[in-house]
Amino acid sequence: QDQARAGDAFGRGRLKLHVLPFVEQERYDELLWACDINFVRGEDSFVRAQWAGRPFIWHIYPQHDGVHMQKLRAFMAHYCEGLPPDAAQALQALWLGWNGEGGVSAWNDFAQRQSMLRQHSRGWARRLAGNNLALNMLDFFREVGKMRGFKIQAGGKL
């Protein structure tokens, strides 16, 4: 069979893949919450996968000059902060393999650390949910101000 269809299921070792039909956009978050691991593509799905608090693999859209791999590596470095080195390595190897740099043989290392990666994903989602956009923007502008020699005071005065 050349093409997988909704309802098909495949397995190899501990990996089980279920081909699901497309769902309405309104139900996409529910689908992400229901899966053990999510494979996502595109920025909107990437953000939603982070909010879902489940391990995910980001298949980033290719860009000219390989810029997409720089974005992927930058995000992985940030996302993997706080993970034990072996778990960070397993996640990074699978993400890179899935995006064409390396092999997908990294699956076994990833799968062995699935419980730890699940906890990390939940913690990441909690940190994202706990941040206040207005306060984050203020912190950002304070940092920019420091770099440029400005000081932001109460009342928004420079």
Predicted feature residues:
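Nucleotide-activated donor-binding/catalytic signature segment of Leloir-type glycosyltransferases, i.e.
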Residues: D2-F22
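Short hydrophobic/aromatic-rich motifs at helix boundaries and adjacent loops
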Residues: L17-V19, E43-V47, D109-F110
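C-terminal amphipathic helix plus adjacent low-complexity
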Residues: E81-L158
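A donor-sugar binding/catalytic signature common to diverse glycosyltransferases
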Residues: E24-K71
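Nucleotide-sugar donor-binding patch of glycosyltransferase catalytic domains
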Residues: P55-E101
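N-terminal start-of-chain detector that recognizes signal peptides
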Residues: A9-G13, Y28-D29, F110-A111
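Short charge-dense sequence patches
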Residues: L17-D29, Q89-A90
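Short acidic (Asp/Glu) and glycine-rich catalytic loops that position anionic groups and cofactors
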Residues: R12, Q50-F56, Q114-Q119
